[in-house]
Amino acid sequence: MANLQERGHLLTEQVNPLSQNLDQLSSLELVELFNSEDRKTIEAVAAAKVQIATAIEQTADRLRQGGRLFYVGAGTSGRLGVLDAAECPPTFCTPPELVQGIIAGGAGALVRSSEDLEDRAEDGDAAIAQRHITQLDVVVGITAGGTTPFVQGAINSARQRGALTIFIACVPAEQVSFTADIDIRLLTGPEILAGSTRLKAGTVTKLTLNILSTGVMVKLGKVYGNRMVDVAVTNQKLRDRALRILEDLTGLSREAAGFLLERSGKWVKLALVMHWTGLDKDAGDRLLSAHQGNLREAVASYKNQGN
């Protein structure tokens, strides 16, 4: 591999010929250029769809067995991982330890630039060791340019512990090769502002993490149709969403849906089981548990037994 001090050959560091007069564009021309270039993020995800789908399947399989999902990154990549992890508990009612974000420099790096902390592979190794990663876990390394030592150290450490490793980069393998179980390359080309990977590289990373985490939760039975039936009812907005889900799927009035939601302990999935089967809260909970929380399978099983 080329000397990592020489990065000009990397796709993410190259100069975009379409934006060489960026400082001379009108505001409208600038917006049009960004809009045009951002279309490449959708194309990049499409080109990596097989690898992303494989990541969903294999990650869901590990989590079913009691594993955890970790995102590891530095700078923008790290912040995006932390963001995606933080959205899982309210959206899918997952425990905070199930999906975690690890960023070089820790929590302080979320709001203050700490890019100098990404250059120590041993820190990535230590981050994995501190979380007692095992063969049941999944570690996703996110690095736009593919060379971040913190991320590479974390992935290498996770591989040694038998974890499933996923590498996400925005440069082709011919420029930066790296060994991981699943290699996802999101090629969006040079940035409008040369080297600023918070732009297209950041956008395509966010798109991919959206798909990965949502896909995994779908496979884990956290979704019914396209409804977030495991939503955590923790504020008025989410209570309204929970009530609308119940109203739409059961035909109940809002008042009746509210009563059902309270009887279920504010768990939409359990409320639906109770409504569709006639079971009480405890029996409905046992039925869901017997089917690993999969609402569709639980209800179908109950009805197939002649109930």
UniProtKB/Swiss-Prot annotation:
Domain SIS: 59-222
GO biological process, one term: amino sugar catabolic process
Annotated catalysed reactions: N-acetyl-D-muramate 6-phosphate + H2O = N-acetyl-D-glucosamine 6-phosphate + (R)-lactate
Family in the record: Belongs to the GCKR-like family. MurNAc-6-P etherase subfamily.
HAMAP family from the UniProt entry: MurQ
Function: Specifically catalyzes the cleavage of the D-lactyl ether substituent of MurNAc 6-phosphate, producing GlcNAc 6-phosphate and D-lactate.
GO molecular function list: carbohydrate derivative binding; carbon-oxygen lyase activity; ether hydrolase activity
Known EC number: 4.2.1.126
Catalytic residue list: E87, E118
Pathway recorded for this protein: Amino-sugar metabolism; N-acetylmuramate degradation
The protein, known as: N-acetylmuramic acid 6-phosphate etherase
Keywords assigned: Carbohydrate metabolism, Lyase
Gene3D superfamilies (UniProt xref): 1.10.8.1080, Glucose-6-phosphate isomerase like protein, domain 1
Organism, scientific name: Trichormus variabilis (strain ATCC 29413 / PCC 7937)
The organism's place on the tree of life at top rank: Bacteria
Miscellaneous comment in the UniProt entry for this protein: A lyase-type mechanism (elimination/hydration) is suggested for the cleavage of the lactyl ether bond of MurNAc 6-phosphate, with the formation of an alpha,beta-unsaturated aldehyde intermediate with (E)-stereochemistry, followed by the syn addition of water to give product.
Annotated Pfam families: GKRP-like_C, GKRP_SIS_N
Subunit structure: Homodimer.
